[in-house]
Amino acid sequence: MQISEARAYIGEQCCVTWRDRLGKEQQSVLRVDDLMFVPMYGTYLVGDGEELHLEKVTGITRLE
């Protein structure tokens, strides 16, 4: 997922689909608070309970 795509979800309650280190698909329901760039690690999606590496995110769906 690109930064420009993820930026559209800031402030929204979302279901985020991502791949863990074993390659298995996981889902997390979280409120997307911000995007954060960490030098040498890349961009992270900051939620209300966890941070996900943006390169591992495969999809985001807004929840009502």
Language model features: what each stretch is:
Residues 1-13, 17-64:
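Short beta-rich binding modules
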